[in-house]
Each structure stands twice: as C-alpha cells, then as structure tokens.
Amino acid sequence: MRDENDDDDVKRNTTNTNTFRRAFVTGAASIFTASAAFFQTSSSAFAKLPEFQYEDSELRTAASGMQYADVVVGTGASPQKGQTIQAHYTGRLTNGRTFDSSYERGSPLKFKVGVRQVIQGWDDGILGAEGIEGMKVGGKRVLIIPPELGYGARGAGGVIPGNATLKFDVELVAVL
C-alpha cells in the first residue's frame, strides 16, 4: 500500500533527476562551446604558420611507407635511444589543416626519443630506421607518416581522424 509520503518521494526524486540532467546538459554544452571556440581560434592562428619547403623529388620512402625529406641537414649531435631531446614541430593533416604546433606555443616539445613517448613515426623519423638516417641537432625534416606509424584507426583527441596520414615539419633543437 502506498501513502502520500511515497508520492512525495517519487516527485522529489524525479525533480532531482531532471535538475541534474538539465545541469549536466547545460554544463556539457558550455564545455563544448568553449572547446569549439578554442579550436576555431587556434585553427585560424595555425593558418599563418609557414611550411618547410621541399621538392617532391626530395621525398624518400622507407620500407614502412613513411616518407621524409631533409630541408636542412643538422650539424650537431645525433640523439640515441632513450635520450631526452627538444624538438619544434608543426603537425598537419594531408588536407593542409594544422592540428598542433610547438612554434605556435613558443616552446619546443621535450621528450625521451625511442621509448614510445611519441608516435612511432616520430621515433623512427628522428632516430632513423629502415634506411632513414637519424637527425642531427639543427636539422629540419618533413615526415609524412602513414596511419600505422601514427594514431592508427583510433585517431587522437577528436582532432586527428582515424586512419589519417600525418605531415610533420620537425626541427631538432637539442639533445639534453
């Protein structure tokens, strides 16, 4: 048997649930709008970034399918697996859209190379693999990375679609 208190509890729970849903949807919409504004602003800023210049005839292809071209051959130290390096970069999709750039942030990326802290295409393109000669400090290289050496079918962060071929302009700044 139900009494009036049960009906009040049901109404109160329904009201609380509806209030929570409204707050969640409003919050999610606000976050989405802010994110969209950020990426729209970032994308327009990225559009100004220059690309490394090279001739298609300079592109070499490794057994993995990765293509690369040295725009500037460095004269400094070559990093070894596990060493920390600093590298500036701009990442683009094949349609030319820039998705990330350390140049835009004004600070090079610092990471240990060759230990999977970055995508395999970066490790191979910087250290050298499958006939690719390793980079030296001061070097600038274009890497065209197939999906298997990038983010694969999963893509990344809603910014890089699944199965995307990626183009990176990479400048090896320092071996630390």
Could you describe each region identified by the protein language model?
Residues 2-176:
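Cross-family detector of peptidyl-prolyl cis-trans isomerase
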